[in-house]
Amino acid sequence: MIRAVTRAVRAAVRPARAAAPLASTSASARRPAGAREISALATRENILRAAIAVFAEHGFSGARVEKISTAAGSVDRMIYYYFGNKEGLFVAALEEIYRRFNAAEAGLALNEAEPVESLRAVIGFALDYYRKHPEFINLLNSENLHRGVHTARSPRLREYSSPAIGVIARLLRSGVAKGVFRADVAARDLYLLIAAAGYFYQGNRFTLSAFLGENLESPAARAHWESFVKDMVMRAIAA
């Protein structure tokens, strides 16, 4: 009799014990999913970071997928998984360097009530950014050698140009309202003037140093150029 009762109790308890791990298994399955998403994002970011460095050093044509995956501490198939192919990765790298530029510029403490000083700050920022981020110049040089075929495939680059030009447009409007800037200057033209002055100097600093017989990378030479560009821009747009 006692044995029969004991067996009945064990039979009743057994399903409950078996059911308990189901809830635990379900919860643990949810947790790794979030961890996998974080890991996937980190893998993609590592690949993109490595790609920018490798493309900057070797250009699009010279960069090899296996070199990028090795630099990222990953494997080739992950590049194809996240970016499709080397071309897709290069487009993503170009988008990323523009995104970084905009993010850095957005951190400037600009006062639209002081358009002259704020515009001078924008010019100084642009020239300094080109100097501190040679990968920006190098990737654009490589893309221009390919006649912009990769940037043409990106739907985001036009989106990234809007904030950069928008900063200048707001300062121009403020300056016009205060009577210190001409009203017939387009923000696009001013953006091109500033970008050209910074890009050309940084992108050609080695050959120009040899051609001119002076070190254009010296602090004194850079300070002189920045002062000259600021003065040139202000004279061009002064009312």
Q: Residue locations for each model-derived region?
A:
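All-alpha amphipathic helical-bundle segments outside canonical DNA-binding/catalytic cores
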Residues: 117, 155-160, 177-193, 224
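Short hydrophobic clusters on alpha-helical segments that form packing/core surfaces
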Residues: 47-55, 126, 233
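Hydrophobic/aromatic residues within well-ordered alpha-helical segments
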Residues: 86, 93, 97, 101, ...
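Amphipathic alpha-helical segments used for helix-helix packing
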Residues: 132-155, 204-212
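Amphipathic alpha-helical linker/stalk segments
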Residues: 93-122, 152, 158-159
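C-terminal peripheral helix-coil segments that are non-catalytic and often amphipathic
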Residues: 1-30, 125-128, 132, 162-178, ...
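Short coil/turn segments at alpha/beta junctions that flank glycine-rich nucleotide-binding fingerprints
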Residues: 57-61, 112, 133, 178
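Helix-turn-helix
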Residues: 42, 46, 54-88, 92
